[in-house]
Amino acid sequence: MIPEKRIIRRIQSGGCAIHCQDCSISQLCIPFTLNEHELDQLDNIIERKKPIQKGQTLFKAGDELKSLYAIRSGTIKSYTITEQGDEQITGFHLAGDLVGFDAIGSGHHPSFAQALETSMVCEIPFETLDDLSGKMPNLRQQMMRLMSGEIKGDQDMILLLSKKNAEERLAAFIYNLSCRFAQRGFSPREFRLTMTRGDIGNYLGLTVETISRLLGRFQKSGMLAVKGKYITIENNDALAQLAGHTRNVA
């Protein structure tokens, strides 16, 4: 039986709200490891925002840190602007990811966050979340795990750019996307790229022409099937090996 206070809260927040207890990607997000009472406390501080349209920003570089954002659906890219005025993409965030961690140190966002497609996010006021985490060890531990994952991702990206050639970079990018889709319950073999080839090239330090040429080469070799933005992994072993992994795609 659903407690009365939870029913009231759901009615007040509108029919489009999905609460932590019901969210299909909660195991990737803050609610993971929290008990029902802790989930209720977390649920009370979260604001379910209306859809973020393609091209809209969650925050801009220099903005004060007020909230973290948990992605419920869609894709968000983070980027900075170089001294020369060029965009430099620093990450692609999928459902279950939290955006805004890099602002905790200074209290201001060092980067921009922009929707690549219509996306749904949960806004989590940081000061309230920080206060709650001081009272709830499980929440604090989960926050540490999520931040650790962010650091590991940054380290992997540094290794990717410093050690791998163009083929290996793109293979690693596609392999990583495949694994992330699998974690979210989607097909790891067939998926749509929500980012442009220009975005992928920017992120990997490659030109658009190089990305297109490599995708054609991967398709010709039988490793991938490429149709517009749709990717089908035809040879898991070859992709994993080129990406520097020995484990097959799940």
Swiss-Prot record:
Residues covered by region (Activating region 3B): 81
Region (Activating region 1C): 181-191
Keywords: 4Fe-4S, Activator, Cytoplasm, DNA-binding, Iron, Iron-sulfur, Metal-binding, Repressor, Transcription, Transcription regulation
Record region (Activating region 3D): 112
Cofactors demanded by this protein: [4Fe-4S] cluster
Region (Activating region 3C): 85-87
CDD domains with a match to the protein in the record: CAP_ED (cd00038), HTH_CRP (cd00092)
Chain spans, region Essential for the oxygen-regulated activity: 20-29
Binding site for [4Fe-4S] cluster: 20, 23, 29, 122
Regions recorded as binding DNA: 197-216
Region: Dimerization, residue numbers: 140-159
Function noted in UniProt: Global transcription factor that controls the expression of over 100 target genes in response to anoxia. It facilitates the adaptation to anaerobic growth conditions by regulating the expression of gene products that are involved in anaerobic energy metabolism. When the terminal electron acceptor, O(2), is no longer available, it represses the synthesis of enzymes involved in aerobic respiration and increases the synthesis of enzymes required for anaerobic respiration.
Name of the protein this chain belongs to: Fumarate and nitrate reduction regulatory protein
Lineage of producing organism: Bacteria, Pseudomonadati, Pseudomonadota, Gammaproteobacteria, Enterobacterales
Record gene name: fnr
